[in-house]
């Protein structure tokens, strides 16, 4: 009885957890439905707003088409007025051209007279052009002298640096010479001291032959070193003399260059003085030329005045009628002047109106381009919506395939479950048919141990299933999306069925092991204790997982059917909206093509 109560307590929390899972799945499905409904409402409101915007745009386009017609009428009237005004202006231009031709003839006569005067001036100026040529040649020479002076300055700087380096070398060599001379003097003093010592110790030579041999070697070495030092001193003296000669040569060259620079500077100063004197002469000559030119102009004006007087005196008698005629023309022009001013004001107003019309037309074109851009954007959004709908359809198809596979797996698990149940009932019947006398010789300690181990295994598996359900419950709140909850529930049901099957197989194996008798020492037992675990096993098996999986599959199928219906409705709405947009764009394009054709005509 205790085992039965334990197994029923292990089964009831599993069923409760499965019911909680089903409730959570229903809540998820309802939340998804609410989200879909909200999205559908938002899309419908957006579509309504877009339809209203399109209707407003159509009304604006119609109004602007009417305005364009009115503007065309105004343009026709303005063109007629412009034709009349152009004819009037052409007549005035012809009169002005006649007057201009007269003025050109007079100007040509004056130009010929001035050309004659200019020729005489050119002959005088040809003699004066020789002086600028000489100035240019002098300027070139000055530039050449300046370039040479720059080169000499650079060479002088180089020579100075070379002299500085030579002085430094000379100082170093002089120091080395002094050192060598000091060393030579030291060696000579040492040699003199060594020569005096052997003279003093001449009677003691036979005793010190062996001792004097290393002293002789040292003296030879010292002599060799002295010879080397003398040769080095001679070489240094020669190099010093050479450097002194080079320094003297360089100093002489520097003096020569300095003299040349001084001579060049003197020549440049002379050339500058000559240039200044020539500039003064040129200025005086230019002043005289300007004075003569002014006098010639005055003489020409006097001659023209005299010629005009002669002509006026000659033409005074026959030309008395012409001033009267000109006066009449002037009076007519003065009387017509206000009319011309009015016409000009009208033309200005018409031009301003035309500019306003052009600006309005440009604004209309900009608005039309903006509307076309908006239509293009709407088409793009519709295309994106269609792509999303296609993706949703694919996802739904994939989910349906997954669910079909899960249903097939559930059917297979149901079949296995039924087979295990039949085997279980068969084994129970076999256990009931056995004689109780046989069980007296069976090792009940082994049987009870195997049954307890199987029960403990089942309890451990039940606890593990509970922990897995708790983990799934925690993960479902955070990461389950769309239809993953269905897949998790189906996988869990499938695992629980497989585990129950394995538990049934283990129980059947324990029963078969118990059927084999063992000749060990018999133990006293009661029949109730033997039948109680079997009854407990019989109560553990019917956990009814097929009913739960069937409910989940029905809910999933119902949800998928609703999703398919909504997707189809969305497709229909989008198709109708796309057709309306295409019709509207075709209508607007036809309208504006007709307007453009009429403008070209």
UniProtKB/Swiss-Prot annotation:
Positions of modified residues (Phosphoserine): 544
Key words of the record: Cilium biogenesis/degradation, Coiled coil, Cytoplasm, Phosphoprotein
Location of the protein in the cell: Cytoplasm
InterPro entries cross-referenced by the UniProt entry: Cep63/Deup1_N
GO terms classed as biological process: cell projection organization; centriole replication; de novo centriole assembly involved in multi-ciliated epithelial cell differentiation; multi-ciliated epithelial cell differentiation
Keyword Cytoplasm: yes
Basic and acidic residues compositional bias, start-end: 121-131
Regions annotated as coiled coil: 14-59, 86-197, 226-278, 340-397, 555-586
Region annotation Disordered: where it falls in the sequence: 115-135, 188-213, 307-326
Domain of life: Eukaryota
Primary residence: cytoplasm
Molecular function, one GO term: identical protein binding
GO CC annotations, alphabetized: centriole; cytoplasm; deuterosome
Pfam families in the record: CEP63
Role: Key structural component of the deuterosome, a structure that promotes de novo centriole amplification in multiciliated cells. Deuterosome-mediated centriole amplification occurs in terminally differentiated multiciliated cells and can generate more than 100 centrioles. Probably sufficient for the specification and formation of the deuterosome inner core. Interacts with CEP152 and recruits PLK4 to activate centriole biogenesis.
Subunit structure: Interacts with CEP152; the interaction is mutually exclusive with CEP63.
Family of this protein: Belongs to the CEP63 family.
Protein name as it appears in the record: Deuterosome assembly protein 1
Lineage of the organism: Eukaryota, Metazoa, Chordata, Craniata, Vertebrata
């Amino acid at each position: 009885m205790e085992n039965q109560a334990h197994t029923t307590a292990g089964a009831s929390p599993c069923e409760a957890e499965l019911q909680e899972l089903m409730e959570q799945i229903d809540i998820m499905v309802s939340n998804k439905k609410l989200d879909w409904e909200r999205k559908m409402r938002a899309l419908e409101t957006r579509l309504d707003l877009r339809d209203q915007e399109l209707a407003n745009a159509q009304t604006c386009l119609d109004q602007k088409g009417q305005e364009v017609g009115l503007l065309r009428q105004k343009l026709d009237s303005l063109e007629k007025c412009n034709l009349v005004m152009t004819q009037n202006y052409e007549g005035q231009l012809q009169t002005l051209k006649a007057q201009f031709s007269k003025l050109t003839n007079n100007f040509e006569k004056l130009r010929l007279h001035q050309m004659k005067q200019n020729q005489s001036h050119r002959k005088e100026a040809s003699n004066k052009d020789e002086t600028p040529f000489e100035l240019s040649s002098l300027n070139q020479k000055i530039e050449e002298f300046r370039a040479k002076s720059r080169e000499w300055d650079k060479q002088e700087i180089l020579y100075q640096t070379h002299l500085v380096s030579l002085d430094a070398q000379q100082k170093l060599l002089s120091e080395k010479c002094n050192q060598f001379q000091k060393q030579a003097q030291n060696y000579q003093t040492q040699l003199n001291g060594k020569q005096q010592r052997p003279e003093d110790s001449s009677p003691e030579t036979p005793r010190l032959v062996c001792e004097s041999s290393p002293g002789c070697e040292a003296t030879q070495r010292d002599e060799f070193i002295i010879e080397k030092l003398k040769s080095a001193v001679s070489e240094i003296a020669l190099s010093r003399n050479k450097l002194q000669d080079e320094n003297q040569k360089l100093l002489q060259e520097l003096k020569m260059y300095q003299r040349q620079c001084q001579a060049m500077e003197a020549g440049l100063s002379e050339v500058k003085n000559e240039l200044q004197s020539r500039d003064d002469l040129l200025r005086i000559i230019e002043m005289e030329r300007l004075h003569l030119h002014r006098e010639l102009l005055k003489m020409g004006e006097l001659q023209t005045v005299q010629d005009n007087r002669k002509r006026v005196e000659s033409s005074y008698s026959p030309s008395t009628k012409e001033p009267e005629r000109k006066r009449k023309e002037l009076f007519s022009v003065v009387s017509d002047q206000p009319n011309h001013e009015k016409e000009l004001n009208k033309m200005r107003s018409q031009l301003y109106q035309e500019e306003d019309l052009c600006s309005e037309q440009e604004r209309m074109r900009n608005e039309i381009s903006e509307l076309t851009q908006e239509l293009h954007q709407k088409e793009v959004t519709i295309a994106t919506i269609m792509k999303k709908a296609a993706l949703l359809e694919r996802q739904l198809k994939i989910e349906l395939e997954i669910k079909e596979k899960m249903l097939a797996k559930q059917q297979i698990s149901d079949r296995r479950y039924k087979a295990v149940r039949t085997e279980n009932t068969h084994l129970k019947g076999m256990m009931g048919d056995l004689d109780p006398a046989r069980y007296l010789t069976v090792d009940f300690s082994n049987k009870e141990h195997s049954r307890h181990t199987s029960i403990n295994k089942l309890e451990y598996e039940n606890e593990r299933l509970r922990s897995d359900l708790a983990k799934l419950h925690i993960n479902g709140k955070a990461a389950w999306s769309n239809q993953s909850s269905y897949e998790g529930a189906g996988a869990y049901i499938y695992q629980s069925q497989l585990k129950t099957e394995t538990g049934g197989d283990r129980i059947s194996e324990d029963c078969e092991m118990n059927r084999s008798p063992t000749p060990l020492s018999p133990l006293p037992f009661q029949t109730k204790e033997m039948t109680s675990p079997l009854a407990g096993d019989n109560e553990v098996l019917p956990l009814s997982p097929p009913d739960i999986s069937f409910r989940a599959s029905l809910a999933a199928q119902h949800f998928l059917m609703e999703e398919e219906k909504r997707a189809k409705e969305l497709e229909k709405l989008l198709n109708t909206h796309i057709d309306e947009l295409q019709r509207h764009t075709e209508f607007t394009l036809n309208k504006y093509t007709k307007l453009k054709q009429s403008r070209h005509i």
